[in-house]
């Protein structure tokens, strides 16, 4: 334990570590959460002098939007949808531009395009919600089921795979609860989902020198070696890297959740994620989806940390270690679109390469003849990869230093 605390203090004393943590916090929490909620994400859009075309009034807009959505009764039925569309069209006809910003028009418009494509008027420049006849918006859940079936068939997911996905989807409660959706869509679709990509950069910078940096200055390590041995030092470094990973995640996640609670509160936590993407099959509400996404990031970050520390233990050069570490995450992202679909799915199992937004998709893996929904593997395989790398990091470091 003494070795761990020494290594932990040693890591946090580095100026580069403090700078990385500060930059990561500013980028993700200040810009990616607080200012996004208050300004350029949800601020009212009538101030054209602003760099983002938004007023600095996101808190008020969010609260007004939540209150407006609650006026529709809490359940999403044909009548609810008709009322939402009719109300929007009436406000638009009355020129109530400010009031329109309180509506979930982007979400509702995506529902209309998905479920009622025959009502789309290609000659009309307006969005569907502006001109579609509300009385024709019937059979919401029947149409959703039909669209889901058609999507699975077009995707080649038929037979046993289709049945497997239907079994998962069958657990989704209907009718859906309805409150303000746009905030949760932004939160789950980008804010939490992007955390892993952001952490990968700063974890790579900090942890790449954890082992490799000792080749530039061995003094403190040599002193410790006389009493403890390289193996124990390597283990202390591994634990330090894991502790830093968890600490960085906790700092970002807790700060982001506090920001979320301040701006959005808990309203809408029990809505199904199908409100964001109708053909999603996951039987999750918004809160469960958020917990999954944060767990995905934490476990993926631990897995990535294990890989970075293994590379750092095996390579003497700090810069090369950093480049190789970043290539583990960003390399597959850059080449994925040029690869066959099955290979793309395989690359998603690399820590922080896949996306937590797979909970909105119907991707599956077939392992030893058994179908497994992709989110199950995306949250387990990456951390196992990192854990498997850690003993090799210890052995590699000990072997190199003894040589």
Residues of each region from the PLM?
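Hydrophobic transmembrane alpha-helix segments characteristic of membrane transport
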Residues: 217-221
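N-terminal Sec/SRP start-transfer signal
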Residues: 1-23
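Central hydrophobic cores of alpha-helical transmembrane segments
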Residues: 21-25, 319-332, 350-351
């Amino acid at each position: 334990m003494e070795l761990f605390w020494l290594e932990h203090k040693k890591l946090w004393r580095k100026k580069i570590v403090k700078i990385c943590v500060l930059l990561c916090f500013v980028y993700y929490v200040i810009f990616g959460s607080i200012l996004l909620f208050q300004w350029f994400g949800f601020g009212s859009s009538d101030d054209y002098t602003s760099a983002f075309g938004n007023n600095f009034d996101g808190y008020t807009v969010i609260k007004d939007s939540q209150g407006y959505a609650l006026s529709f009764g809490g359940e999403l039925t044909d009548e609810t949808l008709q009322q939402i569309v009719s109300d929007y069209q009436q406000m638009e006809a009355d020129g109530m531009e400010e009031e329109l910003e309180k509506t979930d028009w982007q979400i509702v418009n995506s529902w209309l395009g998905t479920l009622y494509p025959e009502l789309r008027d290609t000659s009309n420049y307006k969005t569907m919600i502006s001109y579609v006849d509300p009385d024709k918006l019937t059979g919401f859940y029947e149409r959703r089921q039909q669209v889901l079936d058609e999507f699975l068939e077009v995707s080649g997911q038929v037979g046993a795979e289709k049945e497997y996905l239907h079994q998962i989807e069958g657990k989704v409660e209907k009718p859906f609860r309805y409150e303000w959706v746009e905030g949760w869509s932004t939160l789950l679709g980008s804010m939490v989902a992007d955390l892993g990509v952001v952490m990968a950069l700063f974890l790579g910078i900090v942890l790449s020198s954890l082992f490799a940096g000792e080749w530039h200055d061995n003094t403190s390590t040599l002193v410790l070696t006389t009493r403890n041995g390289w193996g124990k030092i390597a283990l202390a470094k591994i634990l330090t890297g894991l502790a830093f990973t968890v600490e960085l995640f906790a700092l970002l996640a807790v700060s982001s959740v506090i920001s979320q609670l301040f701006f959005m509160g808990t309203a809408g936590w029990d809505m199904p994620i199908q409100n964001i993407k109708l053909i999603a099959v996951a039987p999750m509400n918004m809160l469960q989806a958020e917990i999954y996404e944060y767990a995905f990031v934490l476990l993926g970050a631990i897995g990535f940390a294990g890989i970075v520390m293994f590379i750092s233990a095996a390579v003497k050069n700090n810069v090369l270690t950093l480049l190789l570490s970043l290539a583990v995450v960003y390399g597959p992202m850059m080449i994925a679109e040029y690869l066959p679909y099955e290979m793309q799915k395989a690359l998603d199992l690399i820590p922080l390469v896949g996306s937590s937004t797979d909970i909105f998709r119907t991707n599956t893996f077939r392992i030893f003849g058994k179908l497994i929904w992709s989110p199950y593997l995306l949250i387990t395989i990456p951390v196992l990869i990192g854990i498997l790398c850690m003993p090799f990091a210890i052995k590699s470091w000990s072997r190199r230093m003894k040589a």
